[in-house]
Amino acid sequence: MSYTLGIDIGTFESKGVIVDGDGKVVATASRPHKMLVPRPGWAEHRPKQDWWGDFVHICQAMLAQSGIDPKAIRCVGASAIGPCMLPVDANGEALSNAALYGVDARAAVEIEELDAEIGRERILAACGNALTSQSVGPKILWLRKNRPQIFDAAAKIVTSTTYVVQKLTGECVIDHYSAANFSPVYLIGKGWSGELKSDLIDFDRLPRLAWSTDIV
């Protein structure tokens, strides 16, 4: 019999499940972690400990609980909080803590700057989203302005699911739905684009685009 394993990494906890071919649950596990608040308005995770560490721990716990041969796991699904902003090196290793989704408001000044430069209505029309603390683009600009050494050293800027999938497969990939939060450099129907902001980041430093149903 073959099995499917799924893990979801959340703000304060990660959880996993293994199901058989009929959808019957054969194992579950979870693991808590902390959200770091190093400064007011900031919210961070430690990717190696909180994301990958949880993933490995939960997989091991569920395999031990079920007694399943790991080779019988035919499909792995990874879901994680997002959109987050994480600079990584060429090997996919984190260069800093990850700035989390909308609960992290460090880029408020950068949102105002991009709105003034590009135009709020233009961004909304082209991207389908206004710039908010949920947007990754302003946080990339924040990183470039406030942590230039880390920005320059980063081979890629990724989000949480990309980080985990790269650990599993070696592929640096992001699904279109997550990438849509990278405004103003992801446009509706176009993907990565410098049409609104050409000098924010080189596009070879962003993950390859794919659909959430693609196998990588």
Task: Set out the residue ranges of the language-model regions.
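Gly/Ser/Thr-rich active-site cleft segment
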Residues: 9-11, 22, 88, 123-216
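A charged helix-plus-loop insertion that forms the helical arch/lid used to bind
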Residues: 93-106, 181
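N-terminal glycine/serine-rich phosphate-binding loop of ATP-dependent small-molecule kinases
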Residues: 1-97, 125, 153, 203, ...
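Short alpha-helix plus adjacent loop in nuclease-associated cores
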Residues: 102-117
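Acidic-glycine-rich active-site phosphate/pyrophosphate-binding loop
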Residues: 27-30, 109, 212-216
